[in-house]
Amino acid sequence: MFENLTDKLERSFKILKGEGRITEIIVAETLKEIRRALIDADVNYKVAKSFTDEVKHKALGQDVLKSVKPGQMMNKIVRDELAQLMGGTATDIKLEGNPAVILIAGLQGSGKTTFSGKLASMLKSKKGRQVLLVAGDVYRPAAIDQLKVLGGQIGVEVYTEEGNQNPVEIAENAIKYARQKSYNTVIVDTAGRLAVDEAMMQEITAIKAAVKPSETLFVVDSMTGQDAVNTAKEFNDRLDFDGVVLTKLDGDTRGGAAISIRSVVNKPLKFISSGEKMDSLQVFHPERMADRILGMGDVVALVERAQEQYDEEAARKLKKKLVKDQFNFNDFIEQINQIKKMGNLKDIASMIPGMGKMLKDVDIPDDAFKQTEAIISSMTPAEREKPEIINAKRRERIAKGSGTTMADVNRLMKKFEETRKMMKMVAGGGMKMPRMGRGGVRR
């Protein structure tokens, strides 16, 4: 996400390298490159121009402190202005009324239905809400089926009315049903179209008037770039929505929509979404996104994701095993599963400062752990429990069973030993390593 833009912005800051003061000529040259980078990233031209004008105003005449280089000063100004351009601070979702009604709108294929499921999951798990999903796309049976599947995955009821082709009536009946069943949150998934048309606008406007939502969210596909911004503007002129959701940020997106949309539509970007997993939804934080665009990562988001998967009791048990030198392949595979739950590996890596740039051209597939899991699955329960018994003959059998080579198995065994040592040192506060079990390493 944003790797190309990040790379170009970093190159533009190098113009200031070696300068003792930020001068008008140097600023003009730097901002020319920044503006070009933004436009290449599909940022709206007027937004890019206004942004660089504001940066110029802030930068000119800045005295560079001895401890701060001009490039660092410009980087900070750009970071602050980027955050401001995207909204300044995060905007929370409004959950007013009983039930609180959230209306989801957008074009077909934008990811509305998947987002509806993700939002329901987030509100249920993080805010303790009792959520009802409403299948309001009466024109696409597949959308109704998809919502039912998502609801089943996250344990949320999906309200449908088979045979009823009136989405306004369905939404009204769903709210009555929610009150009867004591649901305090209703998420209405609506029909999309391949393009903005009058019939679509009339329908979504009628649904909004009927259900009086506390929040209307417009979902756009970030991969459509500037078209996403233009579509959002058209919708907002008619629907007057409350916030924007950007989906498919894990795709080949240049980032222009995320940067432009707040300024063009004058509505906050509230959520960003990537991937198909129900937990891959994030509240949009402008400051954090500015950091990621400038290659600074997003350590806060990384810690938050890790905390969501953290099991204190399991961690205590693992620490005991580590200290006693009992860490085995069952524990190893459990740690892999914890990492996988955190989401797309490349997305996680991009949250680590500098890592996104390093992995720009590296393809990290979602099944990156597949070979490791296959090898461990080919071990017997005894081998997983006591790795030290895995001799050459056993390794050969494991390789055949997993469809891998002896070299692959040996690499995994080496990686396992390194992981075991490292985790034991962390658990023991960096204490000196005692010898491993039989067949292990003596120190």
Give the role of each language-model region.
Residues 16, 42, 78, 107, ...:
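Residue-level signature of catalytic and energy-coupling elements of molecular machines
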Residues 29, 33, 50, 54, ...:
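Amphipathic alpha-helical interaction segments
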Residues 40, 57-60, 83, 87, ...:
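Generic secondary-structure signature for well-ordered alpha-helical cores
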Residues 110, 139-141, 165-167, 192-196, ...:
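Short, small-residue-enriched loops and turns at beta-alpha junctions
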Residues 171-175, 179, 183, 195, ...:
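Conserved phosphate-handling catalytic cores of large alpha/beta enzymes
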